[in-house]
């Protein structure tokens, strides 16, 4: 009887890097293996990058539990380190039993989980003894979530007949080298290191930890919790991949939040600038810094749905450069049919989004300092207390700023005390930022006027208005209670009419392919 050969990567094919979030790994591991990875292996070489497992919410995800365990090590009153580690181990062992059929693969995985959790508890006990945690130790603790998740996903792939290899990226940075700055040369080095580790496994399908290190100053401090996306982006760059895929539990990027706007439509194509604006103003797309790494390398990004793997998704690509680096005018690359390029260039607005839980701070100068000194003092205070401003409008003696209201309360209170020394302080709570985004709105006259007129007709008052010099977004601050109404009004008046002039049908052919650009 012949034994079926496991599926593996074909070295003659181009790479696709697929990043999966923690909830996808937690809820859909078989779908990832069978409907996504195995499907793409027929046309591409595939590398998987996974976040730490979650089940339903990030609040009960592995990363959150690891953060809680770190706090327990520092402050025993928070909880038992041993109990928290056992919860993490038990959760992963149960997942192994639920999703893996082969007893040998299952037992090997459970043994590896136990060894990882013993190591994790040693790190936490060291924190407890020293009563402090360094950035490096914190990274080692948090990175354990990705290690457990990727071991699990590699085992699931093996169980489904895919020759996979777990790759731990937690020590890819040469500790003998000193990096004074995390600049372009550092990220180029990281991309090269990630790619080297992946290509070293030959034709096996690599399952890569989204955590990588050890980054000078700490990965969480320097990159933040979006480090898994960043790892996938750098790996795509290092492999010169044909495409980076970000797999979520939504079909892609919509013209508005479909949970709040029933008529919202899936966007087949969007520029990086538009995606960055939507991310910043409330829509979870992909971090702009992560996106810039891939865009600079001229690699398209595709947002796809694990629950609907055959869906078209949304492609993010730069519309000012082609895949081969030749400069183009400010419209989609000429590799697309002319009618698609023309349609995209004339579409105007792309999407509308809301960012809730906003406060507005109005500061009227007491004129004790000069106009430029007034502004400099405000920004110095914001920097001192690490307060990020979403929107700002200024005049010689007056500044209005919109900030996220759930920032550190202590820092915000201290900042208010210092700001009051500069003049009169007026604070408005319970607000939201409404943003209309579209790179090509500049090509159409009157978008701002139409937006504000429609809000006025709907009896929605505007507290503050802001528009950047790039004209890629028009934002205003409104009452949070009116946010959903405003979303629907603007979508109906400024985005639904565009559906009549949507990207031609050939564009759907582009987004149905496993990659955007063909040779």
From Swiss-Prot:
EC numbers: 2.7.2.4
GO cellular component, one term: cytosol
Modified residues (Phosphothreonine): 328
Residues bearing PTM Phosphoserine: 326
Pathway assigned to this chain's UniProt record: Amino-acid biosynthesis; L-methionine biosynthesis via de novo pathway; L-homoserine from L-aspartate: step 1/3; Amino-acid biosynthesis; L-threonine biosynthesis; L-threonine from L-aspartate: step 1/5
Keywords: Amino-acid biosynthesis, ATP-binding, Kinase, Methionine biosynthesis, Nucleotide-binding, Phosphoprotein, Repeat, Threonine biosynthesis, Transferase
Catalytic activity: L-aspartate + ATP = 4-phospho-L-aspartate + ADP
GO molecular function: aspartate kinase activity; ATP binding
A GO biological process held by the record: threonine biosynthetic process
PANTHER family xrefs: ASPARTATE KINASE, ASPARTOKINASE
Primary role: Phosphorylates aspartate, the first step in the biosynthesis of amino acids that derive from aspartate (the aspartate family of amino acids), including methioinine and threonine, the latter of which is a precursor to isoleucine.
Name listed for the protein in its UniProt record: Aspartokinase
